[in-house]
Amino acid sequence: MNDLKGKRLLVLAGVNPIAADVVQFAKRMGVYTIVTGNLDVTLTPAKRFADQIETVSTADLDALEALAKEVKADGIMTGSSEFSIEMTMALCKRLNKPFYCTKEQWDICSNKNNFKELCRTHHVPVVHEFHVEETDEGIDCSSLIYPVIVKPVDGSGGGGISVCNDEEAFLAAYERAKSYSPTGSVIIETYVISDEIGISYAIQNGKGYLTAMHDRYLRESDGNFMKLPLAYIYPSKHLQFYQETQNQKVVEMFESIG
């Protein structure tokens, strides 16, 4: 990694703490880090570790382009905020800089309908979904079998997600999910009560690798849908079954989009 010593990295950062990990990792490799965002240092974890702090908003693409040229950035990176990822991707395209995914790949993985279609193409199982019809008279939801989970197709961070056990709850949840979707699109799925797992993959030079699988344990709900995790246990008790039945299909699926 010595070839990175002295390189200059512009990091788009907000309140998300993952950008701070990016900055610290880059600095360990001798990279000079410039962190930008219009929030105060106290609200931006990445700024606490940066070699240089800027205040250009991560929402101002023109100003970001000017800043990247001014600081002579060799590369541009961000944390896990979906908004910041999209802005970083757009900025890299403007400046002809590399980024870890393309717009096409991002549009597949960040859109629940697109991602489920990719899964189906590669015979990776997905949860059953329902379709409702909106008319001038309202929404025909007679096809639903409760409980269902309602989500914005292209939302993030758990916003706009609801579990519904009856029609009254569904109608309210449907409008709520639409309000969280940039395109006003909603996906309705069977609500599955089962073990919760998390699976991590790394993609390098077009090759996919399963890197980790954990069991996720959640606290009891306090009335909100988003339950907070109590613990992640590695490796998952389902790891062997997953490797034997699904992993190769998922690897091939990710490799199919580059």
Residue ranges of each PLM-predicted region?
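ATP-dependent carboxylate/phosphate-activation module, predominantly the ATP-grasp catalytic core
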Residues: 190-193, 197, 201-258
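Flexible, glycine-rich phosphate/dinucleotide-binding loops
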Residues: 18, 42-43, 138, 170, ...
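Active-site nucleotide/adenylate-binding loops and adjacent lid/helix of ATP-dependent enzymes
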Residues: 106-187, 193, 204-205, 235-251
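Short, charged, surface-exposed secondary-structure boundary motifs
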Residues: 44-48, 63-66, 107-114, 160, ...
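Glycine/Thr-rich phosphate-binding loops of Rossmann-like dinucleotide-binding domains
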Residues: 19, 86, 158-159, 197
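ATP-binding N-terminal substructure of ATP-dependent carboxylate-amine bond-forming enzymes
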Residues: 1-105
